[in-house]
Every structure is written in C-alpha cells, then in structure tokens.
C-alpha cells in the first residue's frame, strides 16, 4: 500500500518502482537499503536497514568492568580501538579514576593515528572507486597525467615514467581478464566525470594509499602492542616507557619513539601532497555533487567533541575537537551536549526489531534495554527471505537515537560544521581555502561531495594534532615524567558498590558514546550508541527518517539498474563497506550484482 507524508522538509512517498540494495556491510555488520523512484528516476523514499544483531551489550552484563574494553573493541575492526577508548573513559568515570597526563596524551595519539588511517582508507579504498573510473585510466596520456599531478603538488612520485608503469600494470591486469575487486564496477557510468589523466592519477594514488596505510597504523603497535585491536587499560595505557634502556624489556624506547616521529612526518606528507589535492580534483570535476545528498546536514548535526588536551577534563575548554548540536538549521546557535541529560539522548524502537515496555517512548542509554524482538510484520517474501521491507512497521536491527527529539547526522561533516560555526580558527581557514579553490559556497559542504572533502580536511587536522601530542609526550619524557597508568583503584574492593559512568569520543565516522552501570563490582547495564546508530537510524514514532535515508531523498539516478548514485552517497558516510551487493527489482528478481567498495 502506497504511503505519502511530510517530514524534515521532505515528501516521503513509497509509490513507484522499488529497488533493493542488499547487503551493504558496515561497522557493526550488514546494511540493506531500499528506495522508491518515480518516473524521472528520482528517489522519493529511502529505507535503511541494519540486518545483523550485535548483542555485545547483553554479553557484557555480569562481567568485570575492567575487561569491557576488550569486548567492545571487537564491535569494529576498521576504526579499531575507538570503542575501547570510549569504554575505559566510561569505567574510569564510573569508578572515579584519574589517569596520568602521559596516558591522556598517548590515548590522543592513538585516536589521531586512527583518524589519519581511517580517513585515508575511506577516501581511497572505500569511496574512491565511486569517483575514479579505473578502466578509463587506460585512455590517459602518462605525460599529461604527470603534468596534472605536478601542477597539484610536489609529490615526488609523479613522473611520466611512473604513471606509464602504473598504466601498464593496469593494462596487464585488464587484459588478463581477472579484474578481481574491480570486476563489478560501473565503469563508463555517466556519473564518472574525471578526465582519463585524473583517473590514472587517482588509481596510482589508490595503490600508494593501499601500501602506505600499513605504515601509519604501526603507531598503534608501538603504544598498543598490536593492530587491529590494540591493548588499553582502565587507569591509563599499558605501555611502559624506557628511554634510557634501564627499565622493562620490551617497553617503548627511543628507537620506537623515533619510528613514531618518522611515521608522523611521512603521514603529513602523504595527506598534504596526495590526499588533499586528490579530494580537490574530485571536487573540480564533480561540482554538481555539492548539491546532492544534503540530507540532514543543513538541519540537524551532532558532535560530542574529542581530544581532551587536559587529562581527566572533558569540558569544552579542554576538547580540541569542539562538540555541540544544531537543530532546525540554526547554525548560529550551537547548543551544548550533555550525555547524562535524559531529555537529550533517547533511543526509540518502534521501527526496530527490539522491544521496550512502551515502544512509543524513547529511553536514555542509562535506562536502555537491549531485548531483541524480530518481527518483520507484513513484508513481501517471508520472515527469513524478505523481498521488500515494510517501513511502516519494524524493519531494522538498529535503534533510532534522537537528540531532543531530532534525527541527527554525525561524522566528519557534522564535526566540521560545528567547529566552523563555533569559530574554530583552523577549521574556518581550512574549509574556506577548500571552498574558495572550488569556487563553491560554504553550503556546498552540506552534500555528498562535502563529506568527501571533510575527510581530507580532517585528515590534515588530525595529523597536525598527532604531531602536537607527540611533542607534548616527548617534553614530558625529557622532564622525567614517565608515568602511563594509575593503579590506585585497580582492585574492585576500592570501588563503590553502585556507580555509573559515561565515556564519549569522536570515532572517524562520528559521535560515539558508552554508558556503563556497575553494581557489586560487575557490569549491570552497558549501552553503546555508535555513529552508525545515528546515521543508519530507522524511522521513529513521529515518522522522522534517519541521516542515510534523508541523504538519498531527491537524488536522480541516471541508470537505476546501476545505482552508482546510491553508493556514492552511502559511501560518503563510510558505513565500512566490503561485500558484493545485489540490486533487486520490485518483483524480487535480481537485476544486477555489484561490488560495493
């Protein structure tokens, strides 16, 4: 039955042809997307569905709070470590543990490293092939490609011979008939706008980034012992410091610290001379995408803030990445966010496969309930083989978080807009420079293209903070301050019988919060609201759509059976994609299989 209604400035209408994209994998599992298109192939309805139940919040009940970080870290293997960071913050907040300055600095180094790594991997490996036509690169003139690259930056790997070699490697790959990960791309799609030379340059940098990302993450192995899933500890960091070779064997020494500095220098070089110029090149060829995929970004955005410069201080004066919330498009009024305020953050489940005592009411995470209740309702197909979801009923394993009743967008774009409108000088300078180079207004950031540009902006910001915190660490070490952990309250006997705490930070993909309640030295309630929960949110009792759903509204598809436009916008949020996708017609028959990168 068709349904039409108004919400958040959009007319949602599920009449017309239905396309199903399933699965699209993301951080916590797999994601499904369904859209309706009208006679002009314009999306009039979008449905975002999380198709995998997580359950870690249930697993944590009754466990030792000091172990929580090791469990929740496994929520995601891509933005690895960030859930552990939020977890140790939450447990320390509950118990009342103060960490040493070095522990705070090293945690910020770990987070800044993750931002640099994740933004590079997203830009090239996950979203890049939505903009770079690999096969078109075979038509490029390597000499012209070299001239283009050298006009953009002083990156040394830009000679005609270098691009000739890359093109030759690609040609052999294609001629062999084994395209591998590039096999199911929509090469030649009319939305690919880069010149052959820009495509060859982008493909070459794709290969370089694939190799270089392995180097960046070595910083995690220095301070966390391994990657993915580095080690953390409630009360600080588990790495001892031994700069004069007199301490513990295996501790962080000057050789490893020099390695960290070398990686930071090379990371800054790659971001400034490869990633940022590539992002601007994509922008130059794709300016219409500065008006596509706006979604909630011009209405409601949210950031918790991150990178406390002062140990144990999460106030606005300490956070180098500002936090705040904007609703109803009023960017002149960036409101403070309090994660303990039960009227601010609430999660709804009336369109999710969970159950509350009253499904029409939202619940603050401290009062959160994770009770799965799979009840797809009246769908096309069967409960185990759904051909088409019914968004008027329950349709996702993702709850619907709301801030003061509003659906919000989180992530790099949200953070950038909030920092910009709070007057952060570095953000204003960077954003204005980018938009001036592209001859686009600031509103052009509120788009699919804008999310891509914000990744480049944030990568530059993060690597500058990586150097900043490393310099702070080295100053402390030179002054004889080697402490990395506070174990005064390690033993449960020193804890209150009942306590609760909140840990928050900004994952590369957006606002991340953990809420922990402890009773009798064991976890009583543990709730996570992750970035994808916000962005991939289903509808709520008011019919408000989530950020993914809103961003797809109004998008015109050139070739519905080749939904590059859908993938571009979804990838701009970075739901951590890796699997093959199937596009289904409204009768349930498969139209085409695509590789989602």
From Swiss-Prot:
The keyword Membrane applies. Its EC number is 1.12.99.6. Binds 1 nickel ion per subunit. Ni(2+) binds at residues 76, 79, 576, 579. It is found in: Cell membrane. It catalyses: H2 + A = AH2. Its main location: membrane. Its cofactor is Ni(2+). Heterodimer of a large and a small subunit. This is Hydrogenase-1 large chain. The gene is hyaB.
